[in-house]
Amino acid sequence: MYCLPNHLFFFTFDRKWSSNFPKNGGVYLVFDKGVLIYVGESANVKERMKDFKRTVNHTFRRKLGKHLFKGATITNGKFNDEIESYLNQYYIDNISVSAIEIIFGRTEIESNLIEKYKKSGILNSESKRNATQFI
């Protein structure tokens, strides 16, 4: 997915950043310089976005760090301070997120988007869920 959605929020470390997202369940898309690199779902997207900046809490941040720093290791839920600092700046310079509220079927939508874009280099791993695939 190389087009930008209508509601794209560029990452900031401002506490109000997560208020851009719905409190309800939904699917969110993470973009690196406008290119889709991660698909996620949550029962509360706003709360999930609060976790977005913490390596210990968010799979995307761990995967991005390992992708950018081949061989980087995580200790006590985070990278070393130098890598964490670089990731913070990388988020600010490159990362944006879009989300849509979806009450029912969000895991199926997430799974289908991952399946559709897995060959384009997204950082999602194979789904551990046994969601029905609708293509």
Predicted regions and their residues:
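Short, exposed beta-strand/loop patches in secreted or surface proteins that constitute
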Residues: 1, 88, 115
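GIY-YIG nuclease catalytic motif and its immediate N-terminal context
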Residues: 1-54, 80-82, 100, 127-135
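C-terminal charged interaction modules
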Residues: 104-135
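Conserved short loop/helix modules at catalytic or binding sites
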Residues: 45-103
